[in-house]
């Protein structure tokens, strides 16, 4: 098993690869931060669902993500793009006044704040800044 330096970026890459291959499900290693990010994705309508899987034979948990497709033939992903902003080597922070707007408000920024993980809209409403984790549109 390989060591993953940035598990959030790994999750995004797995999702992008699954979308490019038109897969409906993708499985990845579990972490609490990934679950919080996926809760935001589900709430904002970027994925259909996700669930945490436990295996009796192993102590490792996994997350199964059900991707969301739209359009006449259900062939266009609800996710057009994902960008990891703050990385382990370069953290990006933003004050509440300077929170980024993704595609003039049509996308979502995920912000890690003192109140937990929030979307850019929720962080503006709560008047808190924090680490800019990712953009999704």
Curated annotation (Swiss-Prot):
The keyword Ribonucleoprotein applies. SUPFAM superfamilies: Ribosomal protein S8. GO terms for biological process: translation. GO terms for cellular component: ribonucleoprotein complex; ribosome. HAMAP family: Ribosomal_uS8_B. Part of the 30S ribosomal subunit. Contacts proteins S5 and S12. It comes from Metamycoplasma arthritidis (strain 158L3-1) (Mycoplasma arthritidis). This is Small ribosomal subunit protein uS8. One of the primary rRNA binding proteins, it binds directly to 16S rRNA central domain where it helps coordinate assembly of the platform of the 30S subunit. The gene is rpsH. PANTHER family: 40S RIBOSOMAL PROTEIN S15A (PTHR11758). Belongs to the universal ribosomal protein uS8 family. GO terms for molecular function: rRNA binding; structural constituent of ribosome. Keywords: Ribonucleoprotein, Ribosomal protein, RNA-binding, rRNA-binding. InterPro entries: Ribosomal_uS8, Ribosomal_uS8_CS, Ribosomal_uS8_sf. The lineage of its organism: Bacteria, Bacillati, Mycoplasmatota, Mycoplasmoidales, Metamycoplasmataceae. It holds the Pfam family Ribosomal_S8. Gene3D superfamilies: 3.30.1370.30, 3.30.1490.10.
